[in-house]
Amino acid sequence: NGNKINITYEGHSFMLKFPPHPSRNKEMSYTNGCISEYVACHIFGMLGFRVQDTLLGNYVDSRGKSKLVVACRDFTEDGKKLMEFAHLKNTCIDSEQNGYGKELSSILEAIDEQTLYPADELRAFFWDMFIADALLGNFDRHNGNWGLLVDEEAQSVEIAPVYDCGSCLY
């Protein structure tokens, strides 16, 4: 992953993601991650998912060097808080692994055991996201980059928009 900074654009908060420095193995470099993030998010959107808003742009640094970046709009700016599935999974007493454990059976058990969101809807979303990630070649979906949005004031919970798609399309 490259560097990230926060900016305000047209009155909204965005996280700018910069490409990482190229690795020694240029063929397996993540320098296209910004393009992948943008394109994959738009494909997820075309598939019917709620997804983070993304923009492609150029960032000119203090030395005048231009870099391709992706801007990801903050979907928590309305006071909602992101609860990563890893945190939700940690609240499940019977979970055999920590929140980041990747065993499918443990993930499905946590989906069934959690009480914040209807389990059948969360399970359906998980499988839909799983299939879309597979179609897009996302090798980096884990329990820390999907989850729920919690609005404590309104006492409501919803599935967070799909985000962190920079490892797709490789």
Annotate the PLM regions.
Residues 71-130:
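ATP-dependent phospho-/nucleotidyl transfer catalytic cores
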Residues 1-95:
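Conserved ATP-binding subdomain of kinase catalytic cores across diverse folds
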Residues 105-169:
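Conserved kinase catalytic-core segment
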